[in-house]
């Protein structure tokens, strides 16, 4: 009979519904089961009549799933009430117990596994007998511990709900000298369990990082002939007016992020050293004026570039007369302002 029941359990496993989730590690579950309980090797003493060995069995269980391969379960089993009749005695036997087992499983897929449970059951067995000859009734009970072996298949219907088909065997439930029998029990059951903590945790979405400051670089070119007299580094009134117009655009500079660099350039007339010094003084004059208007002093700096980076190129190489050469090289005499940190600069001021 045991072989037949196990074969049925394996065959029915083929009809498992498609699962949606496998159990997670380190989670708890609880469930209940109902099935066919069959007693074996009953051998009631002084009974020569029929014994109803097939009964309804049920149980409840809870467990902890350590990982896909190992879990632990504790449960209560009602193994059923087995009546018997004989020419001498009529009576009944019932058994129940609390079991503790280790559950060893092997995943077939992410959602279906086979398993075995190994452990023990603390049971209580009760008998009630009526003597047909004397008319006397007698009640007895016994308690003890027996090994438990189980095997089955388990699959998930949803991430939280799982079903199992299981065959369980419990050996020697009772003392024949005390209650008149010592049967074994096989329980083929269908169970349903609820698994805690199976839902996917909502992902923690990090807030989008603040956009990086859009540091833009703007270039302004002011003609030195508008700002200064020839060969001088003192601002003319026209130059101050041009810088006033520029300041109206620079005033939106964020002092925490922005910076202004003023570059002074000269033409090639004169020595390198002289032109370097003149370019530095002119750049500093522009810086000083813009600071006086309100540009933070720690956000603006001056740099003299001398006669480097001429914009006229070779245009004036054939000009020999000094006045004409000075006029031809006028574009080289300039002040460039490089601004970082201003997003909206309208237009270049007219010099």
Swiss-Prot record:
Please give the NCBIfam families that the UniProt record associates with this protein.
PRK10808.1
Alphabetized Pfam families for the sequence: OmpA, OmpA_membrane
What does the subunit comment say?
Monomer and homodimer.
- Write down the InterPro entries for this protein, in alphabetical order: Bact_OuterMem_StrucFunc (IPR050330), OMP/PagP_b-brl (IPR011250), OMP_bac (IPR006664), OmpA (IPR002368), OmpA-like (IPR006665), OMPA-like_CS (IPR006690), OmpA-like_sf (IPR036737), OmpA-like_TM_dom (IPR000498)
Secreted listed as a keyword: no
Protein name as catalogued: Outer membrane protein A
Disulfide bonding pattern of the chain: 316-328
Q: Please list the GO biological process terms of this entry.
A: monoatomic ion transmembrane transport
The record's subcellular locations are: Cell outer membrane
Present the record's domain note.
The extracellular loops are most variable in sequence, and in some bacteria confer sensitivity to phage and/or colicins.
- Membrane protein topology class: Multi-pass membrane protein
Where do the segments described as 4 X 2 AA tandem repeats of A-P lie?
A: 206-213
The record's keywords, sorted A to Z, are: Cell outer membrane, Conjugation, Disulfide bond, Ion transport, Membrane, Porin, Repeat, Signal, Transmembrane, Transmembrane beta strand, Transport
Q: Which PANTHER family match?
A: LIPOPROTEIN YIAD-RELATED, STATOR ELEMENT OF FLAGELLAR MOTOR COMPLEX
- Residue ranges spanning the membrane: these are 27-37, 55-66, 70-78, 96-107, 112-120, 147-156, 161-168, 187-195
The positions making up the signal sequence are 1-21
